[in-house]
Amino acid sequence: MSSQVFCISTGQTVSVCLPANEDPVEFPGAFFTPNAKKPTVYIKKETDLSLLRSHVYDGIKDGSVTVSQINSYLYMVLKDIREKPDKNWTSFGVELGKKNEPMGIFDLLNVEDVKGKELDKKGQDTRLPGDDLWLPTLIFGLYRVSRATQVEYKKTLMTNLYAQCKLRTKDAEEIVDETAEFFNAWANDSNFTKIVAAVDMYFHHFKKSDHAPIRFGTIVSRFKDCAALSTLSHLQKVTGLPIEEVFTWVFNKSVQDDLLRMMTPGQEIDQADSYMPYLIDMGLSTKSPYSSTKNPSFHFWGQLTAFLVKSARAKNALVPVDIAYHELTTAALLFAYAIGRSSELEQRFVLNGKKFTKEKDSREDNDTTPPSERNVVVWLAWWEDIKHEITPDMKAFAKRAVERVGDIRVNSVAEYARKLFA
């Protein structure tokens, strides 16, 4: 897309444009259009589970296991799990399960059998079926560990993972060192990630299943690359406003554009049992429209607002690059200040008919005292009255929010706010 400008000195009309250096987003709904179909996973369906189990155990122990063997093993040990949905289960027009009829994990996928290298039969049939109680938990847990970036957090995850394995059976073994990295490559295999997503999607639906704790490792697949959606949900919670009222506090076009894209209809964002939360690992999208990368203005504005209203979680959010910091910061401060200066406290129950009646506020035309209500129209009128100038009290409000924070992450929202307001 290009626009035209006129050069005064030469009299030329110049078409101006920017390089198209970003891939377009892909919405999950597009995967199912025009034909509603399940995502396809390619798996070598082994016939000898006993031999496969031994290969996988030994391969995980020495780091030589292939992701193809992992996929085959997971399929073999999980395919017979059955649960009955309490209602018909559909997503994007795809029928996944019928009410009160048994269904399995792999009913969420179209499974294609593929040929592959035969397993070496050199006397490796040494493991017992009891391993199937804990090996899948270990495998999925290693996927979660592979996505962690901080060393100490990885160590904590490994400790908790082995605890989960022990809960499955006391015979679980600690066969992977906390410094191992061979499993990091599994995330690059689309068949493996589809299995991860299907397992999490299945047990998110059947939360009471005896096998549901396996989600310790798979849960990171849900809403992967959807940080901006998480920001929206978090902002709604910490402000205490209905979601539609949060939208009325959007004053920046870049934030508006991000939200319009995220709210593209027909994507099943608000359907808990949809394929949508697994758009990345299911292969529905290669570029999420809900990531912080694709929605940097909204993500920054939302996280800074949340931080200023004392959200502990928001302090570690990373600050995006190349956004309109000044405008977004001003808008976030105004929103947070309005939330911090006002409340929606009122009597909710009465006894013996004794109800407090609030007198209507009467503001003078030249009154520059901040409003005591959360009506965005009233606040914008006040903002006009003070000539769009950040007041000393607004600065003090932001400074108090910054001063309460201890350790601060580099390039985080908290670091940005401290440099600006402290």
Swiss-Prot record:
Keywords: Capsid protein, Helical capsid protein, Host cytoplasm, Ribonucleoprotein, RNA-binding, Viral nucleoprotein, Virion. It holds the Pfam family Rhabdo_ncap. It is found in: Virion; Host cytoplasm. Changing K37R: In strain: Isolate CIN0309R, Isolate CIN0318R, Isolate CIN0327R, Isolate CIN0327M, Isolate CIN0331M, Isolate CIN0360R and Isolate CIN0360V. SUPFAM superfamilies: Rhabdovirus nucleoprotein-like. GO terms for cellular component: helical viral capsid; host cell cytoplasm; ribonucleoprotein complex; viral nucleocapsid. It comes from the Viruses. Disulfide bonds: none annotated. Signal peptide: none annotated. GO terms for molecular function: RNA binding. The keyword Ubl conjugation does not apply. Residues 1-180 are annotated as: Interaction with the phosphoprotein (N0-P). RNA binds at residues 320-422. Its main location: virion. Residues 320-390 are annotated as: Interaction with the phosphoprotein (N-RNA-P). The keyword Ribonucleoprotein applies. Homomultimerizes to form the nucleocapsid. Binds to viral genomic RNA; this interaction contributes to the virion assembly. N in the nucleocapsid interacts (via C-terminus) with the P protein (via C-terminus); this interaction allows to package the L polymerase in the virion and positions the polymerase on the template, since P acts as a bridge between N and L. N(0) interacts with the P protein; this interaction prevents the uncontrolled aggregation of N(0). Interacts with the matrix protein (inner layer); this interaction contributes to the virion assembly. Interacts with the L polymerase. Encapsidates the genome in a ratio of one N per nine ribonucleotides, protecting it from nucleases. The encapsidated genomic RNA is termed the NC and serves as template for transcription and replication. The nucleocapsid is bullet-shaped with the tip containing 8 turns of a conical spiral before reaching the helical cylindrical trunk. Nucleocapsid assembly is concomitant with replication, therefore viral replication depends on the intracellular concentration of free N, termed N(0). All replicative products are resistant to nucleases. This is Nucleoprotein. It comes from Chandipura virus (strain I653514). The lineage of its organism: Viruses, Riboviria, Orthornavirae, Negarnaviricota, Haploviricotina. The gene is N.
